Amino acid sequence: MWRLPGLLGRALPRTLGPSLWRVTPKSTSPDGPQTTSSTLLVPVPNLDRSGPHGPGTSGGPRSHGWKDAFQWMSSRVSPNTLWDAISWGTLAVLALQLARQIHFQASLPAGPQRVEHCSWHSPLDRFFSSPLWHPCSSLRQHILPSPDGPAPRHTGLREPRLGQEEASAQPRNFSHNSLRGARPQDPSEEGPGDFGFLHASSSIESEAKPAQPQPTGEKEQDKSKTLSLEEAVTSIQQLFQLSVSIAFNFLGTENMKSGDHTAAFSYFQKAAARGYSKAQYNAGLCHEHGRGTPRDISKAVLYYQLAASQGHSLAQYRYARCLLRDPASSWNPERQRAVSLLKQAADSGLREAQAFLGVLFTKEPYLDEQRAVKYLWLAANNGDSQSRYHLGICYEKGLGVQRNLGEALRCYQQSAALGNEAAQERLRALFSMGAAAPGPSDLTVTGLKSFSSPSLCSLNTLLAGTSRLPHASSTGNLGLLCRSGHLGASLEASSRAIPPHPYPLERSVVRLGFG
């Protein structure tokens, strides 16, 4: 019992103060070893074995010697007792964990099948046999069965070896979910890869079904994969070329707006050389009007033809006009080709082509009154005020439609409201003659005095207002068709017919360069 206080004092020398144990520091005895005042002593019970003889009676020198020796050893307690407690506590925790692992291993059922499936190869086997493996990978061809072939039974022997090679290049602790989240971002996946993915998953589900090998099918599959890769590379190259062409065309339009025609034409030419139809059309405009390059109609026709062959509606319209304007194209096949291109552009919704065909079909040898009304009506509904005015003439004279004077007046009013000067002049003439609400006979007389024939050649003064319309730069000066004897006027006359504007061509290029 007399050793217990010493053990407690040795284990808890710092946490227990003298006030708790009601012990004061031991002072220095004259004949004993000296102790420091900071050393704490635990209470020592009265271990005097003298019994009831009283304090003055001693149990002998041997008994007092053991007590003094123990007190002297207790006063020399080492200050490293906290480190000892931590060390022993750590060892105790490790021992508990070891016992827990031993208990868990002992609870598992024993057997060769369980040991094989619990090996570290099992997660890699499931990974390499899953459809998440890249469909175009060379490893997958040796691991997964082909879509048409059997599921080889030796894949389980080869997969761990391939899995070890792959594990050296990837972190070993990545999860199945992280792989699934990263796979859709693979840029090399295309449509054939998805098709192979479906076949791979179905072959895994039917892995237990035996089948005969088909070497020919595997070769065809490899060939199709090779072709798919080549198609993917070609598509990427075409996309890159298109992006560069769009950038060049955009720079050309920006330079055209800023007035740098030379730089604009240079950018248009670079984009046109890459096969971009919109840049080819813009380059044709520059050649036709001499902006940034000397004026050359033959080169303009060439660029229009290149863009028209790709389905560019504005290029089809301008190329058809050039064919009709060329004296060498007076023979029938070239005219039919020009009319066919104009129809394609008009059917695509191009207002300029619709207006041009509406007037073209009122003149020989293309005279077709019903088709003329059709295209004039389409152009008028697309906002062309001049076509609305021409449609009013057709209703007033019964050209291609049943004669309707009220509809003719409404067409004149709608065209005049859009700023058409010819329609405004026609309305003023009707009002000055007292024809604001005329009878049928009065309006017939007025119409006969004003118009001798609704044909194109008789509309010289009526079509003169076309030169003052905003779309005259694209449709041409239709009022000069009768005086020139053939469709279209010279480029000089067309340029003079365009209303004065700081950059008429630049506005046309910017508006139509991306259309």
Swiss-Prot record:
Keywords: Apoptosis, Cytoplasm, DNA damage, Membrane, Mitochondrion, Mitochondrion inner membrane, Mitochondrion outer membrane, Repeat, TPR repeat, Transit peptide, Ubl conjugation. Changing residue 242 to E: Impaired oligomerization. Coiled coil: none annotated. Detected in liver, skeletal muscle, kidney, pancreas, spleen, thyroid, testis, ovary, small intestine and colon. The keyword Transcription does not apply. One of its GO terms (biological process) is HRI-mediated signaling. SMART domains: SEL1. Residues 25-40 have a biased composition (Polar residues). Residues 19-65, 144-226 are annotated as: Disordered. TPR repeats lie at residues 213-244, 245-277, 278-312, 313-350, 351-384, 385-422, 472-504. The record marks 142-143 as: Cleavage. One of its GO terms (molecular function) is protein serine/threonine kinase activator activity. Changing residue 403 to S: Impaired oligomerization. GO terms for cellular component: cytosol; mitochondrial inner membrane; mitochondrial outer membrane; mitochondrion. Residues 24-101 form a propeptide. Residues 1-23 form a transit peptide. Interacts with DAP3. Protein kinase activator that acts as a key activator of the integrated stress response (ISR) following various stresses, such as iron deficiency, mitochondrial stress or mitochondrial DNA breaks. Detects impaired protein import and processing in mitochondria, activating the ISR. May also required for the induction of death receptor-mediated apoptosis through the regulation of caspase activation. Belongs to the DELE1 family. PANTHER family: DAP3-BINDING CELL DEATH ENHANCER 1. This is DAP3-binding cell death enhancer 1. It comes from Homo sapiens (Human).
